[in-house]
Amino acid sequence: MESYRKLKENEGYDKSISEYVESNHSRQAATLNNYNISCDIYGGSGLEPAAQIHNEVTAEIIKRLHEQGTISKRSTLQFYDAKAGTFLNGRQVIGRCPIQGCKSEKAYADECDLGHQFEPEELIAPKSQLTGEVPELRPVDNLYFDLPAYLDFMKTYTAKLAQNPQVRSVVSKTMEEWLLPAQLYIQNKFREAFDAVEDQLPEHTVLEPEGNKSSFTVTFPSWKERDDAHAVLANGGVRFRSGKALVPFRITGNIDWGVPVPEVDGVSDVTCWCWPESLWAPISYTRTVLARDAKAAGVTEGVAAQDAALMGEPAADSTQVPAPTYQHSSLDWRDWWCSDDAQIYQFIGQDNIYFYCIAQTAMWEALGWNLTQSTVSACYHLLYMGKKASSSSQTPPPPADDLLNHYTCEQMRAHWLSLGLSEKPVSFSPKAYDTRVTGKDKDGNEVRACDDKRVIDPALKESALLTGVFNRLARSCFYGVAVKEGDESPYRNGCIPAGAASDTVVEAAQQAALAFEQAMYKFETHRALAVCDDYLRAANKRWSDASKAANKLEGEPANAAMTQALVDAFTELRVATVLMHGIVPAGCELICEYFDVDPVAFFSWDNIFASTDEFVESLGEKPGEHRVKPLPPRFDFFSKHESQY
């Protein structure tokens, strides 16, 4: 909303907010296509084909929560800009976070950019982004989910989560921080003022400061008593900061452009706040995909058919991520979300743990629909040139499409997956954008890192694996069996040679597949890529050693040795290509094309432990007779960007 407002006011943008969102969505879809990223649906909750289905899901969930007695009306305070004559939402207010110990650079109406939640009246030094004035606080009615009622459930759930090897410790530890008692932290210099009003406070206990601590702690039975204490302390001139604790989770707001909400408890003419509707948006997208399947199959009964009737068409000029060609095994969304064998995975940044691990978990429990709780993979922050990446900083990171002017999408995919954001914040520092001065030329002019040939590009760290090692192994296999005029070697028949791979090769392939799967099970993509790196380099060396040894022989021993080297190399190439497929799909699918095998069969993990002979037999062919596609001279499966030559 805020970026749209600024565009209209400062640049004369004359289109509707729906058109603005649609244009942004189209650009993002084009970027996903440029990076070879596909999905069942890339949607927007306010855009067709999902918009009307999402409205229906929103109404169903809010009505259900009300039936369960877990949402109700609360009158709370909201910022109001008297000069602009309007209520302020979200990022239209900026100030400092009131949460104890928070180091956020920016805080907004009721949350900071590190994900901390608080009441608007707690925001320190609020300022309207519309006029620069200090806004007023005026009462408004909204619906709130009773999140504190699920404190005991959340404690038990979080303790179990801490034992789950798939869930990173940053998730459970961050969740634990929100499950503490409702507390206020008051600096010692306000102790006299606090003592003067303490008898007016609701029930509480005081924890005296230990050692050299500069503040003491006041603990309340619940958030209600803590909130009641705010006015007493403020009137007494006592400044304070809040500790993290569960508080009612706001469901609605008064923003004009949003998901409509049915009237509940007399609250009407409101829309759903963006965060809660983002929690159930994946359910809406699931239902949209299944509605699309139902429509294509001519299904006329069931929820999917009803959703199909709601489903609209995307804007004619919008860019779309291509839909998959397969049909899903069940059209009932509950089979995907509520069945005993359902698995839900969500990939988020660490600053969104509160929403997707605290609020969502409690809400799913409250609905009573047997919704599967998500397995959340939370990453640390991606830095840019060593600093927090932000579009509003002095050095904002380049848009993803701009990077393709300097790097291939395969190089970027491999590099980003290698960064290890599952363990710590890591800097993305592409040399092409590095403007640091690293020296002077012979004429005394300053040389920037981006132009300095001595500076190694961190973003190309993984590129050598692709353009060097992986290319070399693939070319060696296909050129090794290519028909060659004047060469009567039995393995030069254009087919993958039959025979069992050596024990060393079989063992290495099995260990690589298992290690890769274990890393991916824990969402440790950097470790998965490291497994592939080690495996490819070892496979390339085995091929190099074996082919050189074979070339030193003559006659039948030479033919037998080279055939065995090729059997081993093709085994390793097929396994490596399957492992690397999700990392660098375009190059791997090109290798599959020259194997001349259906991609569904080639990339199926059902065949990962099969020998080459067994794999060929599964295609309905005899070992030694599967013909590969002839490889042109000097062919690259993985290429450098044209600017890198």
Where are the predicted features?
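N-terminal, positively charged nucleic-acid-binding surface of large information/translation enzymes
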Residues: 1-201
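Amphipathic, non-membrane alpha-helical segments in soluble helical-bundle scaffolds
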Residues: 18, 269, 273, 400, ...
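A non-catalytic, amphipathic alpha-helix used as a structural packing/dimerization or gating element
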Residues: 19-30, 60, 465, 469-472, ...
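Intrinsically disordered or highly flexible coil/loop and linker segments, enriched in small
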Residues: 37, 71, 163-164, 285, ...
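Structured secondary-structure scaffolds
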Residues: 56, 127-483, 530
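Basic, alpha-helical terminal appendages of large translation-related enzymes
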Residues: 74-79, 83, 92-115, 121, ...
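A glycine-rich phosphate-binding loop feature that marks nucleotide/adenosyl-phosphate handling sites
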Residues: 80-83, 378-383, 421, 431-438, ...
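Long, amphipathic alpha-helical stalk/connector segments used for oligomerization, subunit docking
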Residues: 432, 452-453, 462-467, 473-528
